[in-house]
């Protein structure tokens, strides 16, 4: 959310957070946030910024901190879920139509007040992947929710199915690296170098999008060599037969971090709840183009939008990039047909 390395004290961090959230607060729009490597710095942590959100916009911020012992402390605190209901009449605590999951990929540097000294030399690097404890929390939390909903909902409600999900985590999982760099998807993904107005092409790729960041490490591969550091939460969510999340549809994993990428494409991840040859979609969120090595002339100003329809929330979701000009690009439905545009036999 903020470039914490530029702050001189915690008050400056708070002022920046309030500046970001003021339009949402004025409009009364609820929001949830993920945080990244620049938020863990001298005068802030992911957890302290979440506290600032709640203090400034109580009732609007849906961001939550994980229970104690989950996520790796205040630097990785924001592991939570947000329920999306079919309508405003839904009972509080009843089973939602959709779950938004947020997993904290940590990274950045330790806060000065969390070290023994006061100088820059005292800051320590924070691991750049979702803490393994989150995998255990996913298991216990999803099972708890399933029990709760089975006790409160009608017996015929979706035949006991766990709600579909959409996952947000700032630093992309290593699966993003694999999709962009290995076949069968690498030659069918991205390919766009400029999104300037009037300069639109898909290069006839099945999964087009901006691909200015051609080489990146993903979780576990930025400051160290990748050795499966991000597998704990992914395997818990998608593969553990004890977890209800593994039996439901995941509409995608959404990440930022790579400012120059905004493509969506399949991955090698398979959810037990999806058809045997279907892969979990991966989507880069669109960098807004305001700040953070601004490339607006080439990358354009925009956001990634997900549009859910309650009539088909179990089978797919519409997504596209919308620019400040009002233009939409890469409008697709993340469904079975889209997933199988390119045969995905890679294991």
Over which residues does each language-model region extend?
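His/acidic metal-ligating clusters that form di-metal
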Residues: 99, 115-262
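Active-site environment of divalent metal-dependent phosphoester hydrolases
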Residues: 4-9, 33-44, 78, 109-111, ...
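Extended active-site neighborhood of metal-dependent phosphoesterases/phosphodiesterases
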Residues: 16-159
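Short aromatic-enriched loop/helix-cap "lid" or pocket-rim segments at secondary-structure transitions
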Residues: 43-47, 113-115, 178-182, 266-267, ...
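Binuclear metal-dependent phosphoesterase catalytic core
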Residues: 84, 220, 261-347
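Structural recognition of the beta-strand scaffold that forms the well-ordered cores
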Residues: 1-2, 30-35, 41-42, 81, ...
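N-terminal active-site segment of His-dependent metallophosphoesterases
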Residues: 1-15, 19
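Residues that flank catalytic or metal-binding motifs in active/ligand-binding sites
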Residues: 76-78, 96-99, 163, 249, ...
């Amino acid at each position: 959310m903020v470039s914490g390395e530029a702050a001189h004290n915690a008050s400056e961090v708070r002022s920046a957070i309030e500046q970001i959230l003021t339009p949402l607060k004025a409009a009364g729009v609820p929001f949830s946030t993920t945080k990244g490597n620049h938020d863990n710095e001298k005068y802030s942590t992911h957890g302290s910024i979440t506290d600032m959100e709640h203090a400034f916009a109580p009732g609007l911020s849906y961001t939550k901190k994980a229970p104690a012992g989950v996520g790796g402390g205040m630097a990785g605190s924001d592991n939570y879920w947000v329920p999306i209901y079919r309508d405003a009449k839904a009972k509080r605590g009843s089973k939602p139509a959709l779950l938004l999951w947020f997993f904290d990929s940590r990274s950045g540097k330790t806060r000065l007040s969390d070290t023994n000294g006061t100088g820059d030399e005292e800051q320590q690097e924070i691991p750049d992947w979702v803490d393994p404890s989150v995998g255990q929390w996913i298991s216990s939390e999803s099972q708890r929710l399933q029990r709760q909903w089975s006790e409160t909902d009608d017996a015929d409600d979706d035949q006991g199915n766990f709600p579909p999900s959409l996952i947000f985590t700032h630093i992309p999982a290593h699966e993003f690296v694999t999709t962009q760099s290995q076949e069968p998807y690498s030659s069918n993904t991205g390919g766009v170098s400029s999104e300037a107005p009037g300069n639109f092409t898909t290069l006839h790729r099945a999964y087009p999008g901006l691909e200015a960041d051609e080489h990146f490490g993903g979780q576990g591969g930025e400051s160290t060599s990748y050795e499966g550091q991000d597998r704990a939460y992914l395997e818990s969510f998608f593969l553990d037969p004890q977890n209800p999340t593994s039996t439901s549809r995941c509409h995608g994993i959404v990440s930022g971090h790579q400012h120059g990428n905004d493509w969506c494409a399949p991955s090698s991840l398979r959810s037990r709840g999806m058809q045997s040859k279907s892969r979990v979609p991966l989507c880069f969120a669109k960098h807004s183009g305001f700040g953070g090595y601004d490339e607006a002339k080439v990358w354009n100003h925009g956001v990634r939008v997900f549009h859910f329809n309650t009539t088909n929330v179990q089978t797919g979701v519409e997504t596209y990039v919308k620019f400040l000009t009002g233009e939409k690009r890469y409008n697709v439905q993340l469904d079975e047909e889209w997933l199988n545009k390119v045969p995905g036999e890679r294991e």
